[in-house]
Amino acid sequence: MLRGDIVKKDSIVRISFAYLFRIKVGNKYLLVKNERNTGKYQPVGGVYKFTENEKMELKNKFHVIDDDRIPIDKSSKDDYRLQLENRYLKKFIKRFDKKANRESIDNLSREFIEELIDKEIVNWNQINYRVCGRHITNLEFSQHFQIYEILLADIVELLPTKDQEIDLKKLAENSSDLYKFADAYEINSLGVDPKNKKLQESIATHTKKILQENEGNLCKLPEQGKCYRVNIIDSNVE
């Protein structure tokens, strides 16, 4: 919170539940370009999706309202990104983990497909990943969105096969506007490099959440340490 402000029970809070992939090759992380024209690179991943029934349930229980801080369109209309009164916040988060009708951590292939498979960056039919934990921000006032917000991001680590490792190394050797590889220093500095006169941020702030050295700071999940294998279904194939 800012300036000693107190968040009241009826204060409106913006909340977002997301998942992010740590995809590491050597000492560098694979990042993809943000699709909302920020020009910045970020981890593969995005906001969890819920079903229409789930949204109705949330309206009935917690009186949630749509989050309009990011334009609601075809790609974002079912995002688990909402606003609600602070009085419901704890129960809302608890419900997300236990009862929510949504994408689950045992199959996080949707964003992987949209950001890597559909764009032909990689051509894989299966992925394996390990659950690392959850990053949770403090409840703070967002200067960007002018609202109190709390952001949750489940972090998973890709466990590539030998063939997939080869593919990733080949990607790292080639340049593309769709993706980039960045080490921890670049990510922590958000891509700013004064020595080379790169003074504009090119990496999104939330990218730091996937760094290997930050894993010990993540909150524990019931699934923490579990590994999942998910078959990939190409959305371009009917």
Predicted feature locations:
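N-terminal leader/linker segments that precede catalytic domains of diphosphate-processing enzymes
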Residues: 1-238
